[in-house]
């Protein structure tokens, strides 16, 4: 067994992050929700034993370990596939809306949701904290990059919300600097330098549309924002409990990661590169001439 592990270490050392990503992705319970620490028994302090074993060619292989490693090898190699190209600068996370990286992800969610549900989908939202890679550099875009960016098994879900609920949703998006695609937002920083929603319109077929508080809109979010139990406003987590009051809640049977991989592949097949999209979906009212 030790020899098999040694051979595994030598053979996949350079691809170990990819292997760990695949193992993590294979765990159905993995999500952004924090795991509870194991219960501690009072006074329990078992003794520790340390030993050293030299792993070299003198130790025979273990067929079970060899078979396990061989099963992952094709998927590890698949992560090195180039699925697209980033051109025009790096994709970076930062600031309100999670920067151009947040725009890239929510643009992809909105595009893929419309492939499934049609153009009636008007808005896509995800949290900035779920984007676990700060930069995707200009150049070749690997499948591994998307796994590193989106390591969680978060599923996309359709929510049918009233216009009033959409505005409440966007208040949380703005105040916690989360990412969205489909809305044009004006915000203003409060005394604590926290951005607050001032106004919002939807961008439908290239035209700005006022949000009708009584109308019904299709919105796509990740299930994490819907299912998590912590709803108190904090510096890192917004209160998305409004999603529980949707008129309709319907899973898309698609994870956020698969949606973005599909999106990149579609863009590549159409001859388009992924470009940093620093558009005006978030505009400061102060910068636009308002007062603070």
Task: Report each predicted region and the residues it spans.
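Bacterial N-terminal signal peptides
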Residues: 15-28
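N-terminal secretory signal peptides that target proteins for export/translocation
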Residues: 1-12
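Position-driven detector of the extreme protein N-terminus
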Residues: 2, 28-31
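Catalytic centers of hydrolytic enzymes
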Residues: 32-292
């Amino acid at each position: 067994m030790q020899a098999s592990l040694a051979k595994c270490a030598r053979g996949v050392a350079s691809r170990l992050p990819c292997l760990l990503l695949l193992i993590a992705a294979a765990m159905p319970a993995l999500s952004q929700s924090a795991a509870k620490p194991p219960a501690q028994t009072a006074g329990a302090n078992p003794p520790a034993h340390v030993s050293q074993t030299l792993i070299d060619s003198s130790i025979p292989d273990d067929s079970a370990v060899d078979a396990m490693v061989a099963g992952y090898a094709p998927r590890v190699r698949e992560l090195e596939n180039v699925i697209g190209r980033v051109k025009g600068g790096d994709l970076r996370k930062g600031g309100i809306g999670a920067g151009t990286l947040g725009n890239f992800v929510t643009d992809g969610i909105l595009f893929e949701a419309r492939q499934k549900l049609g153009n009636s989908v008007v808005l896509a939202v995800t949290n900035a904290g779920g984007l676990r890679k700060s930069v995707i550099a200009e150049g070749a875009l690997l499948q591994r990059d998307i796994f590193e960016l989106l390591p969680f098994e978060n599923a996309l879900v359709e929510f049918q919300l009233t216009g009033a609920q959409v505005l409440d949703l966007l208040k949380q998006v703005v105040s916690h600097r989360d990412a969205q695609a489909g809305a044009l937002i004006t915000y203003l920083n409060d005394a604590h330098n926290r951005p607050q929603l001032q106004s919002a319109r939807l961008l439908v077929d290239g035209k700005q549309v006022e949000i009708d508080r009584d109308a019904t809109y299709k919105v796509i979010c990740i299930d994490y924002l819907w299912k998590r139990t912590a709803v108190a406003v904090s510096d890192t987590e917004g209160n998305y409990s409004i999603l529980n009051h949707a008129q309709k809640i319907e899973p898309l049977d698609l994870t956020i990661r698969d949606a973005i991989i599909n999106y990149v592949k579609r863009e590549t097949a159409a001859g388009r590169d992924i470009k940093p999209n620093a558009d005006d979906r978030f505009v400061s009212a102060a910068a636009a001439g308002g007062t603070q």
